[in-house]
Amino acid sequence: MMQKGFCPLIVIRGAGDMGTGVALELWHAGLHRLVLLECARPRAIRRLVVFSEAVFEGKARVEGLEARLCPDTAACRALWQTGEALPLLVDEDGASLRELCPQVFVDATMSKKARGLSPNMADLVIALGPGIEAGRDVHCVIESFGPDMGRCLRQGQALANTGIPCEHGRSEQRVGRAPCAGVFASP
């Protein structure tokens, strides 16, 4: 149970699909001291519904919540005071972590690697998806695939993503493959 008046500083690395979802859920839960960290050239499949779009546009709005690109941690602190938007920093390597000193760090990059992750990064370090080991790289891993999606693992790794979507018991049959290499152009 959270202490009344206490709001931990939560840093989320990755503002794509998963990071945006995590940020929205935390915000709606009343945890408003959030910072999103993103790389200089983020890639997202659904660009109009991810906070990483703020890297290109200066701001991005998803489900009524705005993320705003900040030049530094001072600008992040100013946004926390006003509550106008979520601060987003371009900081792929996490250089701002030393200055921010978060209580919680969430890796939502889905990189399938423990890229510089350590349980010492914050009081609670969480990673989403496969390739990262709970108990060694982070405190816990959130399962992002299969029947246990959303489960918090305190030891071991999440299931490896096969890359083949499965629905109603059909997997490979649902995947369309290009007959040859090349660039597809639509009229």
Q: Would you name each region that the model predicts?
A:
Residues 2-187:
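Well-ordered secondary-structure scaffolds
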